[in-house]
């Protein structure tokens, strides 16, 4: 399936997993972590 084929791009796969994982499993803590990561990495 499509998700299996995307494993050719490891960096992107991690990002995709995080995008699915944080909103579903930990939406509020996930948003807090995103803001912290954003502030630290300055990628926003």
Swiss-Prot record:
It comes from Lithobates palustris (Pickerel frog). Disulfide bonds join 38-44. It comes from the Eukaryota. Antimicrobial peptide. Residues 1-18 form a propeptide. Belongs to the frog skin active peptide (FSAP) family. Brevinin subfamily. This is Brevinin-1PLa. It is found in: Secreted. Expressed by the skin glands. GO terms for biological process: defense response to bacterium. Its main location: secreted. Keywords: Amphibian defense peptide, Antibiotic, Antimicrobial, Cleavage on pair of basic residues, Disulfide bond, Secreted. GO terms for cellular component: extracellular region. The keyword Disulfide bond applies.
């Amino acid at each position: 399936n499509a998700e299996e084929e995307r494993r050719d791009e490891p960096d992107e796969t991690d990002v995709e997993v995080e995008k699915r994982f944080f909103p579903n499993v930990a939406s509020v803590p996930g948003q807090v972590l995103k803001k912290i990561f954003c502030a630290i990495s300055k990628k926003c």
